Amino acid sequence: LVGSSGKHSNIFTFFLNSITHNIPFKVWANATRNLIDVDDFYDIVHNILNSNMYLNSIINIANPRSYAVPYIVESMENYLGKRALYDTIDKGADFDIDTAQIQPVIEKLNISFDDAYLYRLLKKYHEL
């Protein structure tokens, strides 16, 4: 979940803070992370609750696309115009989150989880 909490307790703000302040960190080469804007998350949940969809059900609310951690770091480097100080280690795993149930809601709300989504998150939560 990406938002402007001001805390460095999620991977998005941790990487941004580390790159910006030249703090070395480790990148798990095989790991993926799912990043979704808190506003998109809210809109999806709000729509589901207000339309009484999926009553008494467990559903996944996530970005339909998870990002490889090295790709996240590379995208941040490109956005910031600055190299990150990191070591890559052979750890982590890819995981899939089934978001098929919320696809109609995503389409209804016109939320675009396209190739530029990560860039839009960077621009929204870390103005240059």
Indicate where each model-derived feature is located.
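NAD(P)-dependent short-chain dehydrogenase/reductase
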Residues: 1-33, 38
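Residue-level detector of conserved, well-ordered beta-strand and adjacent loop positions
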Residues: 28, 62, 103
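Amphipathic alpha-helical segments that line or abut small-molecule/effector binding pockets
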Residues: 39-50, 119, 123
